[in-house]
Amino acid sequence: MSATKLTRREQRARAQHFIDTLEGTAFPNSKRIYLTGTHSGVRVPMREIQLSPTLIGGSKEQPQFEENEAIPVYDTSGPYGDPQIAINVQQGLAKLRQPWIDARGDTEELTVRSSDYTKARLADDGLDELRFSGVLTPKRAKAGRRVTQLHYARQGIITPEMEFIAIRENMGRERIRSEVLRHQHPGMSFGARLPENITAEFVRDEVAAGRAIIPANINHPESEPMIIGRNFLVKVNANIGNSAVTSSIEEEVEKLVWSMRWGADTVMDLSTGRYIHETREWILRNSPVPIGTVPIYQALEKVNGIAEDLTWEAFRDTLLEQAEQGVDYFTIHAGVLLRYVPMTAKRLTGIVSRGGSIMAKWCLSHHQENFLYQHFREICEICAAYDVSLSLGDGLRPGSIQDANDEAQFAELHTLGELTKIAWEYDVQVMIEGPGHVPMQMIRRNMTEELEHCHEAPFYTLGPLTTDIAPGYDHFTSGIGASMIGWFGCAMLCYVTPKEHLGLPNKEDVKQGLITYKIAAHAADLAKGHPGAQIRDNAMSKARFEFRWEDQFNLALDPFTARAYHDETLPQESGKVAHFCSMCGPKFCSMKISQEVRDYAATQTIEMGMADMSENFRARGGEIYLRKEEA
């Protein structure tokens, strides 16, 4: 941690410099590759980690080597991970999906924005210097049409997005030939259906059944298609966003790019401060991953932060504003019903969800039912016109392990299941949000309840945190719960940073949270038995046993930290080829001793074999040639 705290001006200047000098960057000894599909324009990016050869014999002068295969890995960094692509944040990213959207012929450009708030912002000349220059002309579905990936899937249509996802989820494992690398332990999937090869038809079928979603607003053509579902790789979400007291547009764009570099599959913009609209436009136009929001936060800003003054009209205007900007999924707290609020009275920590507390306060002040619940069908109509997925928020999630799995939490969950079926009537894609704070022995029930009552819609959880005693380390406490619930079937994990419960995360906190959650997600994939999940582990273990230090660094989730820790004690170049590390030293390295034992055993086997053959030769009379019947 830096001893010098930057001023707000210095923080903004640093972020501006980051944006101005941004270019595509590969991880050490990695290169960007693209796998193509049958649909036009389907080029799926992956990162391929190049490995050094293994020394297998020979002499010092003429060593013999065996090549090691490059390892392809899932890559969320988009154009920012390709050194061949010129990055210009002022112009935004290329519109990858635009030709696919246009080819379907079911959308139309809007000549006038649907949101009054958007119209007012665009008419305000004072915002010109903050505004993203290349504002997208929004589209919506033509009258009587639905443009969601769920609608297409139910019609039996395999979209380019679905083919893109199938290639991406297979992670290029068909390129791996080594049996050592392909070896994998059987998983325990708890009912998940994990095919050996993921096809576009399998993707379509999972989306059609509601077991998976493809967040892909037609107004976010820059996004690279991805999928959230328990029969696919476990995904990780990162939260960013400014507040009334900290962060700027430049810093949020920097955090966006940083999040994707470290593995965020989606990013939620939780901004609550000034210039929410303008910040979101910059984020969307520069994001290759889906962007989610909590619209009630901005709606609250529009009524000066007074929850009692919220109206359906203000909220509806916010939905239209954000849908036409390109937001891919909305968190909607429509399950916080008036009759559930008293259930939280006996809790130790009450209602801890910001969105949940806003809606609870509105319900109590008006003594009326939650207007998000009352107008849920209208919400679905809006989402169906732009293909905005719904993330049904857990406004009554437990905020302490004492409150875990209580009456209020599961009452809301059951209501979310009812709302899921309504959303599906409109071909709107749905995932369900979950807790929270839950001790380990109570985690699995959350998954089984969700599968049963929410009809196997994808589950998306914040952790859960497994203990409440570690402020400053809640990325650890929640990472434990995240790996468990991911194994049980949770489709996406919302990261927790070291600043959870303490403050707004900075750039380094974002990285720490993401690395922790990429570990949790990968551990869950291994435990479920996701095909190919173990390849990278096998490659790392082989490199470790063969003392290929550079390969160990480069195969790591965080190559820079791995190298830095090694170099703290063995900084010399000779340390990169040494057959030991500073933990045990040269004489007590278990790997080195194991190699010596293996070599000794192999030599002994050869010598014993030769002795057996010699004895057999003498027993047969010492004749060089034997008669045919004796041979």
UniProtKB/Swiss-Prot annotation:
What does the record give as the reaction this protein catalyses? 5-amino-1-(5-phospho-beta-D-ribosyl)imidazole + S-adenosyl-L-methionine = 4-amino-2-methyl-5-(phosphooxymethyl)pyrimidine + CO + 5'-deoxyadenosine + formate + L-methionine + 3 H(+)
Q: Where does substrate bind?
A: N239, M268, Y297, H333, S353, R354, G355, D394, G395, L396, R397, E433, Y460
The record's section on InterPro entries has: ThiC, ThiC-associated_dom, ThiC/Bza_core_dom, ThiC/BzaA/B
| Entry binding sites for Zn(2+) | H437, H501
- Give Gene Ontology CC terms: cytosol
Pathway annotation: Cofactor biosynthesis; thiamine diphosphate biosynthesis
Q: Which GO terms describe its molecular function?
A: 4 iron, 4 sulfur cluster binding; carbon-carbon lyase activity; zinc ion binding
Q: Which cofactor does it need?
A: [4Fe-4S] cluster
Q: Which GO terms describe its biological process?
A: thiamine biosynthetic process; thiamine diphosphate biosynthetic process
Key words, A-Z: 4Fe-4S, Iron, Iron-sulfur, Lyase, Metal-binding, S-adenosyl-L-methionine, Thiamine biosynthesis, Zinc
**According to the UniProt entry, what is the EC number of this protein?**
4.1.99.17
- Residues the entry annotates as binding [4Fe-4S] cluster: C581, C584, C589
Alphabetical list of Pfam families matching this protein:
ThiC-associated (PF13667), ThiC_Rad_SAM (PF01964)
* Record text on cofactor binding: Binds 1 [4Fe-4S] cluster per subunit. The cluster is coordinated with 3 cysteines and an exchangeable S-adenosyl-L-methionine.
UniProt xrefs under PANTHER family: PHOSPHOMETHYLPYRIMIDINE SYNTHASE, CHLOROPLASTIC, THIAMINE BIOSYNTHESIS PROTEIN THIC
Family from the record: Belongs to the ThiC family.
Under the subunit heading, UniProt states: Homodimer.
So what does this one do? Catalyzes the synthesis of the hydroxymethylpyrimidine phosphate (HMP-P) moiety of thiamine from aminoimidazole ribotide (AIR) in a radical S-adenosyl-L-methionine (SAM)-dependent reaction.
What the entry lists under NCBIfam families is as follows:
PRK09284.1, PRK13352.1, thiC
Q: What is this protein called?
A: Phosphomethylpyrimidine synthase
This chain is encoded by the gene named thiC
